[in-house]
Structure formats: structure tokens, C-alpha cells
């Protein structure tokens, strides 16, 4: 019973975490920060500032984004990481389009039925809270490869990582989000030695008594979790020091990727796995490699859309949905009108049905991407739906083939040379599997849940998958991460955009692009607008309801009025208000940068922690 409830609260918390990430200075996030030299946008003010400082010292956007990424691993522990993986989409100053896949890989000891319990039933707790849930991390390999291949050459890796090392070794003030998260997940952190040492301030007699009571079944699990959360240890502005993480970062700064995938850090990872029935071995770490992939490129009303291909499902789905939307006069529709939401929902259903069947790791499964992103295929798919009535998901199947992956973080950088970079990384759910590698100081991912195990099963975000995304050794799980670049009809960078939020990443990036291209909004104004989401299964429209916790943001909410909801219900649509008990009043957090008329404009999400420094220009 305890494990099942842990899973339930884990999922609810994933959807509610950012509801508490709200700073008092929110109005500033709605300004379009602008300047002429460069910009960085991320979920952490400290991380964005690190990137900008590197630019000021002569670095390019690639140097800046690597500094930002390593700093996020310290200052944003719920999603920033060195224990996870991600994707990069970039356009260099010379016009080269680059996409790098540093997604986690399944350990060689993994197998398709690894998350079945002794009774043969699928165990969410094994898939999310055990050491078996961890894939081989790729973030370190990816960031170092970006630095080596595309950095300016003006810095050493130690200089790039100095900000992250300083904040880990000497401490930094936590924001409201981290204070809330450390307390909210207390009952799970207490199950792990490393997490207890970092995230529990004082292992009090009250905590010990509660643990004894629940183990002896003298109090129910729900009461135990509630009482643990009611013990408030952390406040915004408290200082957190992460000495072991600092040591790990120093090893990486000195030895490059070998500072993580070999030597002392590798020893610590493997020892952690052996002690806790995990699967990652020395060979898995030694053999890990990031991979440059063929970019996914499409067009929308003359603009070029550059995104990530498989194992990301984001690029193919975004371009497929834009291809379908090109058949409608979107510019004439009011955003979030009944007509607009109905059209958008039908398009989303069609694309997510294809995601479930056709997409997976291209090294293992030949995904029919050319078919999925063709404009003819988009028109053919639209024949399955009606613009007058909702089409049940049961009536939508994946398209026939022509023979032949809540917790992420996105960060972007653009410089005056023309380099444009977007990176999305993840450890899957907030704080991953809540396990810290003892002695190494970093959280492990639970990305193995992003595989379809068993095929046909829904993951933590309700996404369903089949053979294309089944578990196999050294395979990379399918992802929803969608770093995307929009180029003008003349081929120049207009915007880099991405989001955090599991399956809702794709539809968030889509709606920002629509608002910029069809409605001529700035990246900030596009991010501000309320959003909706549908993904085939479950067959509902999710929308952003009124924020019960911070009413000052309700100028943007709800994304759908009661009148519009009733009108859409008459068309046959079903609904799920984001304002469920989890407190999730919004769907995802977007971050981006726009370059227009010789100026850089940052776009940061008020759904995040609301700090103006999330987006920095100079």
C-alpha cells in the first residue's frame, strides 16, 4: 500500500511542483527584455547569469549554454542535472543546422519485463522509484561534446564550470520552488541516504517517530505523508551546500567526460547500483556516446521549423501538426476560441496516435519520419476528423506506414554572431527517482519509465507506446522534449523555443509557434497566453484553470471560459481542468529567445519561478 501511495503522490506532485515556483516579482517577466549582443533564457536566474557572464567575457552562445546547463545541475535540482540526458538543436553563425542526441540509454542488463513484480503485474514503483528506473546518463557527455565541438575556444572547461562548482561548494540561496519541493518530497528523500544528507535539514525525533508509526502500521500512509509535508524545514532564501556534487563537478572540469564515465565518479555510480539492485555497469558508462542526428526540418507559412528527430517525438509531431494547421486560416481565429480549440484538439489527437505506434530510437526502429512530416500525409490524416464534431480517440488509428519521452528544463542562448542554441534536458519526474549517488552528490534519473514496458502500457504522463519504444539494452527511450528553432523566410534565426512538462511540451511549443507566426506576437506574449492540451489517450482536453494559489496570474487564466467549455462539450469533447487536487493549474513552462529588428528579446514563463533574471540580455 505504501509504495502505491508513494507513486500516486509522486505523480500528483509532478503536476503541482511548479504551482509553488512563484516569485513576487512576476510582472517583470512580462517585459520583453532586449539588447543587441546576446541573450540566455532558463528556469534559473543564477544559471542564466552564468551564461551571460561567459558571453560578456568573449564566449559564444555554445559556451554560454554549457555554462548554463552545468549551473542548472546545482541550482535547479528538480530538473537540472548531470544524471539525466537531453537534446540540443542549434544553428551556427555559418548557417549549419546541428542536432545532438544525448538521451539516456538503457543499461545492457535491462530487459522488457524488468518492471513486473513477483505476481507478474506492472509495478509503477519499480519504474519510477527504484534504481532500476535509471538509464545511463548522457548530460555530461552531451554538454562536453557541445563545448568541444562548437565552443569559441576562448575558455577551458574549468572556467565554463566554475559557476556551477562555486554554487555547489559554497552554497546558493534556494528559491520558493526548491523550498517547497524539499519539504514536499521529504517522505521519499528519507528513503535514501544521499538524498537525506542533502535535502533533510534536521532528521528530527518527530520524523523518526512518524517513520516508526507508518512502518508499524499505527498510522495510515496518507496521514504519514501529510504529517511529513507539514514539517516545514526550508524557506526561500535558505542556503544549500552540495559538497559531494562540487567534487564530482571538479573531476569533470579537470578530466572531461572521463571525470564522470570513468574513475572515481564511475566507481561511485556502480557501487550505488550494486548496493541497490540497479543495472548500470562500468561498461555502460564507458560505452555511452552522444550522437549527432539528422535534423527534422519543415516549413510553416514560409518559415522554416528546425527541430529534433527520434528518439524525440517532438520534432516530427510539431511539424506534422503545423502541416495540418496550414490547411486552416488560423490567423483569422481568435486564440482559444471554440473554433480554434476544436481544430487544435483534432490535430493533436491525430499526431499523438502516430506517436504511439511509429516513433522510437532510430538505432533500433526505422521510424517513418519522412512520411509523418510530409504535407500530403497531413492532408490525408485530416480526412479522419470533422471540424463540426469531436472525433473519439477510439476512431483514430495511427496512419499506415509507407514501406521502408514531468520534469524537464529548457534553456536557450543566442549571440550577436548568429549562433542560436536550444537545449532541453530531463531526469524525468521531479528530482528523478529521488535517489542520490552516495558520495557523488547528484540525483539519478527515472527515464526507463519512458519506455513502453510492457508495450501498450501508459507511462507517468499517460503516454502510450508499443514495440517501437519497447525496452532493449543500449536503446534510448522516446521523449517529448522539443527544442526548436524558427527561421525567417530569408533563412535567418527568428526564435529558439522549448518547454518543460512531459507530454505537454510538444503542444506548448506548437502553440507558441502559432502565436508568433499566425498572430504576430512576441515570444513573451506568446508564452503568456493560456494553453490547452490533448494527446489521443486519455481522450480529454486539458486546460489551464484559475490559479487558486496565486490569483495575480489569473489575468491570463483560465485558458477556457465556462461558456467555451460548454460549447466544446456540445461538439463531443471531454475535459480535465488543470486545477485538480494536485494544484496543477497550468500545463508546461516555455522559455525562448527571439531576434527581431536587430534586438534580442527573451521569453520566460510566469508559470515558472517568476524571476526577471530567468531571461538575461546584454
Predicted regions and their residues:
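Internal maturation/activation junctions in enzymes
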Residues: 328-426, 440, 455-456, 574, ...
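Active-site rim segments in enzyme catalytic domains, especially the processed small/beta chain
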Residues: 74-99, 279-281, 420-489, 519, ...
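Noncatalytic scaffold domains of N-terminal-nucleophile
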Residues: 21-49, 53, 61-255, 260-262, ...
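Bacterial N-terminal signal peptides
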Residues: 8-18
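Bacterial N-terminal signal peptides that target proteins for export
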Residues: 1-8
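Short beta-strand scaffold segments in enzyme catalytic cores
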Residues: 80-81, 85-92, 409-414, 483-485, ...
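Short, small/polar residue-rich loop motifs at catalytic or cofactor-binding pockets
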Residues: 291-292, 405-408, 430, 479-481
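Extended C-terminal subregions enriched in glycine
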Residues: 475, 509-510, 518-584
Amino acid at each position: 500500500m505504501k509504495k502505491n501511495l508513494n507513486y500516486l503522490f509522486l505523480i500528483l506532485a509532478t503536476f503541482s511542483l511548479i504551482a509553488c515556483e512563484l516569485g513576487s516579482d512576476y510582472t517583470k517577466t512580462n517585459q520583453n527584455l532586449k539588447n543587441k549582443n546576446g541573450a540566455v533564457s532558463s528556469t534559473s536566474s543564477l544559471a542564466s547569469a552564468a551564461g551571460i557572464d561567459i558571453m560578456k567575457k568573449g564566449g559564444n552562445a555554445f559556451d554560454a549554454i554549457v555554462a548554463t546547463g552545468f549551473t542548472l545541475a546545482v541550482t535547479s535540482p528538480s530538473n537540472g542535472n548531470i544524471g539525466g540526458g537531453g537534446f540540443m538543436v542549434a544553428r551556427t553563425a555559418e548557417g549549419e543546422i546541428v542536432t545532438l542526441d544525448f538521451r539516456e540509454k538503457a543499461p545492457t542488463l535491462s530487459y522488457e519485463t524488468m518492471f513486473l513484480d513477483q505476481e507478474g503485474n506492472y509495478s509503477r514503483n519499480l519504474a519510477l522509484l527504484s534504481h532500476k528506473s535509471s538509464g545511463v546518463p548522457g548530460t555530461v557527455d552531451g554538454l562536453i561534446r557541445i563545448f568541444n565541438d562548437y565552443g569559441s575556444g576562448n575558455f577551458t572547461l574549468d572556467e565554463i564550470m566554475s559557476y556551477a562548482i562555486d554554487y555547489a561548494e559554497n552554497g546558493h540561496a534556494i528559491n520558493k520552488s526548491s523550498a517547497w519541493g524539499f519539504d514536499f518530497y521529504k517522505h521519499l528523500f528519507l528513503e535514501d541516504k544521499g538524498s537525506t544528507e542533502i535535502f533533510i535539514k534536521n532528521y528530527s525525533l518527530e520524523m523518526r517517530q512518524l517513520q516508526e508509526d507508518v512502518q508499524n502500521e499505527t498510522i495510515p500512509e496518507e496521514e504519514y505523508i501529510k504529517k511529513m509535508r507539514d514539517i516545514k524545514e526550508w524557506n526561500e532564501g535558505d542556503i544549500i551546500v552540495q559538497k559531494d556534487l562540487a567534487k564530482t563537478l571538479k573531476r569533470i572540469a579537470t578530466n572531461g567526460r572521463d571525470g564522470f564515465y570513468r574513475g572515481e565518479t564511475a566507481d561511485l555510480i556502480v557501487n550505488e547500483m550494486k548496493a541497490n539492485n540497479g543495472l548500470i555497469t562500468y561498461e555502460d558508462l564507458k560505452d555511452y556516446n552522444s550522437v549527432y542526428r539528422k535534423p527534422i526540418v519543415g516549413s510553416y507559412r514560409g518559415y522554416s521549423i528546425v527541430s529534433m528527430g527520434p528518439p524525440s517525438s517532438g520534432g516530427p509531431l510539431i511539424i506534422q501538426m503545423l502541416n495540418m494547421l496550414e490547411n486552416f486560416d488560423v490567423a483569422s481565429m481568435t486564440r482559444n476560441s471554440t473554433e480554434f480549440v476544436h481544430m487544435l484538439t483534432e490535430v493533436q489527437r491525430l499526431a499523438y496516435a502516430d506517436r504511439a505506434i511509429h516513433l522510437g530510437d532510430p538505432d533500433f526502429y526505422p521510424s517513418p519520419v519522412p512520411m509523418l512530416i510530409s504535407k500530403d500525409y497531413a492532408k490525408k490524416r485530416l480526412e479522419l476528423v470533422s471540424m463540426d464534431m469531436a472525433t473519439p480517440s477510439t476512431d483514430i488509428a495511427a496512419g499506415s506506414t509507407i514501406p521502408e519521452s514531468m520534469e524537464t528544463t529548457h534553456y536557450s542562448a543566442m549571440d550577436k554572431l548568429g549562433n542560436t542554441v536550444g537545449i532541453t534536458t530531463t531526469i524525468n519526474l521531479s528530482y528523478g527517482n529521488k535517489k542520490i549517488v552516495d558520495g557523488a552528490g547528484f540525483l539519478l534519473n527515472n527515464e526507463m519509465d519512458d519506455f513502453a514496458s510492457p508495450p501498450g502500457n501508459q507511462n507517468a504522463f499517460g503516454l502510450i507506446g508499443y514495440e517501437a519504444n519497447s525496452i532493449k539494452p543500449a536503446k534510448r527511450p522516446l521523449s517529448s522534449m522539443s527544442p526548436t528553432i524558427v527561421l525567417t523566410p530569408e533563412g535567418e534565426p527568428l526564435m529558439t523555443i522549448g518547454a518543460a512538462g512531459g507530454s505537454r511540451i510538444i503542444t506548448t511549443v506548437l502553440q507558441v509557434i502559432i502565436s508568433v507566426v499566425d498572430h504576430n506576437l512576441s515570444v513573451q506574449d506568446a508564452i503568456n497566453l493560456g494553453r490547452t492540451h490533448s494527446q489521443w489517450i486519455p481522450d480529454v482536453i486539458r486546460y489551464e484553470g484559475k490559479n487558486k494559489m496565486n490569483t495575480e496570474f489569473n489575468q491570463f487564466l483560465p485558458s477556457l471560459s465556462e461558456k467555451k467549455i460548454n460549447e466544446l462539450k456540445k461538439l463531443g469533447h471531454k475535459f480535465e481542468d488543470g486545477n485538480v487536487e494536485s494544484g496543477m493549474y497550468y500545463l508546461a513552462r516555455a522559455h525562448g529567445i527571439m531576434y527581431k529588428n536587430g534586438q534580442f528579446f527573451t521569453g520566460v514563463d510566469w508559470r515558472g519561478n517568476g524571476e526577471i533574471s530567468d531571461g538575461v540580455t546584454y
